[in-house]
UniProtKB/Swiss-Prot annotation:
Keyword match Transcription regulation: yes
Protein known as: Probable transcriptional regulatory protein Cj1172c
Organism: Campylobacter jejuni subsp. jejuni serotype O:2 (strain ATCC 700819 / NCTC 11168)
Keywords: Cytoplasm, DNA-binding, Transcription, Transcription regulation
Cell compartment(s), UniProt: Cytoplasm
Listed InterPro entries: Integrase-like_N, TACO1_YebC-like_2nd/3rd_dom, TACO1_YebC_N, Transcrip_reg_TACO1-like, Transcrip_reg_TACO1-like_dom3, YebC-like
Pfam families documented for this protein: TACO1_YebC_N (PF20772), Transcrip_reg (PF01709)
Amino acid sequence: MGRAFEYRRASKEARWDKMSKLFPKLAKAIQVAAKEGGTDPDMNPKLRSAIATAKANNMPKDNIDAAIKRASGKDSADIKNIHYEGKAAHGALVIVECMSDNPTRTVANVKAIFSKNGGEVLQNGSLGFMFTRKAVFHLEKFAGDLEELELDLIDAGLEELEQNEEELVISGDYTAFGELSSAIEAKGLVLKKAGLEYIPNNPVSFSEEQLSDIEKLLDKLEDDDDVQAVYTNID
């Protein structure tokens, strides 16, 4: 989704009712990363980033350690990554990424949210050509020379570097996630959030009235416990 709309969404997510759902989602992301790539953060860039994101959101260390421990436990839940595609009101395109130990429950919930809020679920793959998957790092603002930083990170897979009033955003091809993550850490940059995101190839502008309709669906999706991230083609 476009940066301006992304910040609008971020300000909504900062409300306490949203924050109260955040820690379980962060814990789930840590657990899945640890189970997929091992529990040693030094050897697992996705786990390092999941931990850094949790810390940036003030998640207590005990919660982080517990999530990692659950991943290595014999009875740890089999949490799967699940991907859905759909349309919201006014034709806005939506990609929903979930983590769930009960896919049947999750698909029923996601379909219900779309149908009750003016949208529809599409067949997976329908939106593949409308979005590009990128490794995206949201960082604290950088006080140094941005051109020099850009040159330093190009060999690690940097494709785009953008700084605004809120943060520094660095992105590259999704396959460069690990290498970019290591290079960013080596530069001492302060990470707020990182992951693989779906970036719209042709963002679309909507009126305020249309955005209000679309956000009803987005709010409901983000409130669902199994939903980790929601991406749109909104400019």
